[in-house]
């Protein structure tokens, strides 16, 4: 009887732990960025209009010193931290990934290259933080092959 009671309590506690951490991660949209993005006194920069299909790659928090960069561009040939998860967006660029609590770097993949243009004050690339029980909202971008970005 005691064994049955302990087994029931153990199962209940595991279920509660699983449920509490089950709906956390990141969600967002990937946009294609092109055209005049420079601010001016009488003009707002053009905003991305529609999301695009893309591959999203989540890595352990990655510093600029842990990647092989392509020149001075925000493209990277290889990333020397562990990949946590990879997923494709839908046709409108939307994605949602469940992740454990922690800090990560988010990249979009373009061919064999990874793209991330944002850095924090410690030179970590495209940092995101997943908090317990929360979905972190993310906006990602990819550069267009056909439109200049300035």
What does each model-found stretch correspond to?
Residues 100-108:
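A short tyrosine-centered beta-strand micro-motif
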Residues 84-87, 95, 125-129:
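Beta-strand-rich interaction surfaces with strong enrichment in secreted/lumenal proteins
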Residues 1-7:
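Sec-dependent signal peptide recognition
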Residues 14-71, 110-150:
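Primarily secretory-pathway and cell-envelope proteins
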Residues 66-92:
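Short, acidic Ser/Thr/Gly-rich low-complexity loop/linker segments typical of extracellular
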